[in-house]
């Protein structure tokens, strides 16, 4: 039985990450089968509920106000429109619905009240509800938990050492503090990062080291390949190869056996064969839908065809934890189509 550890050294993780690729894939696949059904893949939908105009300077992000990209600033969506999108996601097979807002941090205002209503509404649909809204205070995390939030995404993005080369408007410790607030509120932690931002292999190991040595491993670990966007500082970064993704996914699977390892951004550039390598290495979650916030993603029909070819089946909701025990009144009919 593989031991669940929170005391990994960078040297140990580096040895795993740098092992021969076929050996690494085999080990990742073996651990994956020990803890998960290898034919099960979690299908998630990510919706941008507030787009563009972000005051931060994340070098990869087309939603930063300071960069000249094609992203148009949009205000926070209406609650009924978000709930309709959630219903459509459920009908298409998603079991987790994540709402993302281009904010630096959550503020205690009417917009946050609307997000609380969105969380309450989606939680009545039988899906895992996730948000990614920026930095959170302990009190805000508690409010989201009380509303029925299942998971909160707040990525580390990269290693502590490389972080300042990518972002300067918030610190690495700011990110870790938000994750602590989420965990203390008994909300599942979703945290991973992006590769292809000019970091070294040592930086990738460093990020995995931080994730694997948290008090509890994240419930979900998104592994993103940079999708360079014209107008951002990282627009000319070379494409991340499938083998780089396989190394990250297999290593994450080995050192965080129970986590959902999500094959996230960059999947649109992969064919079915390349995605199959990632699933074999230990990935067991994807984002479905034509967009990931503002970047392209494979079409729903293409994913359905891939599931058929690879004999994959959607994972049911709440297999990693209990559904919210709070009961809400039925969604008012005026809020949904």
UniProtKB/Swiss-Prot annotation:
Recorded metabolic or biological pathway in which this protein acts: Cofactor biosynthesis; biotin biosynthesis; biotin from 7,8-diaminononanoate: step 2/2
SMART domains linked: BATS, Elp3
Keyword 4Fe-4S listed: yes
EC number annotated for this UniProt entry: 2.8.1.6
Binding site for [4Fe-4S] cluster: 54, 58, 61
PROSITE patterns cross-referenced by the UniProt entry: RADICAL_SAM
UniProt cofactor(s): [4Fe-4S] cluster; [2Fe-2S] cluster
CC cofactor note: Binds 1 [4Fe-4S] cluster. The cluster is coordinated with 3 cysteines and an exchangeable S-adenosyl-L-methionine. Binds 1 [2Fe-2S] cluster. The cluster is coordinated with 3 cysteines and 1 arginine.
Annotated ranges, domain Radical SAM core: 39-267
Reaction catalysis annotation: (4R,5S)-dethiobiotin + (sulfur carrier)-SH + 2 reduced [2Fe-2S]-[ferredoxin] + 2 S-adenosyl-L-methionine = (sulfur carrier)-H + biotin + 2 5'-deoxyadenosine + 2 L-methionine + 2 oxidized [2Fe-2S]-[ferredoxin]
Subunit details: Homodimer.
Family, per entry: Belongs to the radical SAM superfamily. Biotin synthase family.
Protein name stated in the entry: Biotin synthase
Organism: Cytophaga hutchinsonii (strain ATCC 33406 / DSM 1761 / CIP 103989 / NBRC 15051 / NCIMB 9469 / D465)
